[in-house]
């Protein structure tokens, strides 16, 4: 199992990175996210009792309405009130199903130092995707800024061009990954 953690601001291209990597990889690629369990908890405790759909948390038209709730539940409630590694433990359990398989698992929402360290500790790669000029780029919530000064990423991708340019970068990344490269710094030209 190869694990790739992806970090970046909201709407920077983390899920698009996963989708493109999945297209270009020769081995099966699976997506996990710390927020999957978070969204399931929000759904079960808040949305479902009111007859609302789980898809509201992922739908581009409705998910922003829930962002503050997700941030509060995930950070202020679970991480601070329970324990810092609450989501890490949940994701670690999910990773077990891929152990000893020739697959790539992409974790599309690495946001905190302990998540970053966990991925590195199991031999995973860390990718930082940035996208200059995003609206709401000044969101100061800890889940948006905790890794801003982290220098230990294996790859930095500046997603400042077209989708085709981003796709080309991801194809190059897959090539570097297949060749066994540990560090592959790439910059998009837009």
Q: What would you call each of these model-derived segments?
A:
Residues 1-4:
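Extreme N-terminal starter segment of soluble prokaryotic enzymes
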Residues 17:
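Hydrophobic positions on the alpha1 helix immediately C-terminal to the Walker A/P-loop
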Residues 10, 90, 114-122, 128-190:
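Small-molecule kinase domains that catalyze NTP-dependent phosphoryl transfer to phosphate-bearing small molecules
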Residues 34-102:
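ATP-dependent small-molecule kinase phosphotransfer cores
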Residues 23-31:
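Post-Walker A helix-loop "phosphate-sensing" segment adjacent to the P-loop in P-loop NTPases
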Residues 109-112:
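Short, well-ordered beta-to-alpha junction loops that form the rim of enzyme active sites
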Residues 6, 107:
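Hydrophobic anchor at the beta1->P-loop junction of P-loop NTPases
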Residues 14:
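Conserved lysine of the Walker
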